[in-house]
């Protein structure tokens, strides 16, 4: 870990988040979030950063991905039970804003075949883009299952108008080591995006959905 967050602090916080959680069993799988508060940053003037980083362990097991595919990709998706739609199914939505919005809500992310990806704005309008879910490209030399896993384990940092961010870095069924490693990757990547690195970080916390925040920095 970078010198600013000691290994002990990190493990202690992770243990508190994971095992503090065992006192109360929830009916759902709680996500663990990394919450970041920034300083010396002017969202109006300074460049708003965004970046994605792939974590080692999938932070959100329930994260759903839909393939918008050509015939070959749809057949592949069907064989491995991955949700998919072909161009005809997309055309049936008829650019209806409500239906496109519903589609964007139904899945967390999309992958699209090369032949389809360029046509998506024309077929669906701007709906997926507005929802921040424009599909990533899926080529025929990529393994579909591996690509879906990659999308599931990738998190995005995006600076908006406010000085705090939160991203999912794991869930409460992970081991201490898995969660520590994910947080380590996420924090180092985030700090590398900041103009003045650690000088822009006011505070870092981790917390489970229903748990108390634990301060890392």
From Swiss-Prot:
One of the GO biological process terms: cytoplasmic translation
Could you tell me the keywords of this UniProt record? Acetylation, Cytoplasm, Isopeptide bond, Phosphoprotein, Ribonucleoprotein, Ribosomal protein, Ubl conjugation
Show the GO cellular component annotation of the record: cytoplasm; cytosol; cytosolic large ribosomal subunit; cytosolic ribosome; extracellular exosome; focal adhesion; membrane; nucleus
This protein's record includes keyword Transferase: no
Q: Which residues carry this modification: N6-acetyllysine?
A: 91, 106, 118
Quote the InterPro entries the UniProt record gives.
eL8/uL1-like, Ribosomal_uL1, Ribosomal_uL1-like, Ribosomal_uL1/biogenesis, Ribosomal_uL1_3-a/b-sand, Ribosomal_uL1_CS
Q: Position(s) of the covalent cross-link Glycyl lysine isopeptide (Lys-Gly) (interchain with G-Cter in SUMO1)?
A: 118
Q: Where is this cross-link: Glycyl lysine isopeptide (Lys-Gly) (interchain with G-Cter in SUMO2)?
A: 118, 161
Q: Which residues carry this modification: N-acetylserine?
A: 2
Q: Where are the Phosphotyrosine modifications? A: 11
Q: Which GO terms describe its molecular function?
A: RNA binding; structural constituent of ribosome
Q: Where found?
A: Cytoplasm
Source species, domain of life: Eukaryota
Per its UniProt record, what Pfam families does this chain match? Ribosomal_L1
- List the Gene3D superfamilies: 3.30.190.20, 3.40.50.790
State whether it acts alone or in a complex, and with which partners, per the record.
Answer: Component of the large ribosomal subunit.
Known function:
Component of the large ribosomal subunit. The ribosome is a large ribonucleoprotein complex responsible for the synthesis of proteins in the cell.
UniProt family annotation = Belongs to the universal ribosomal protein uL1 family.
This chain belongs to the protein called: Large ribosomal subunit protein uL1
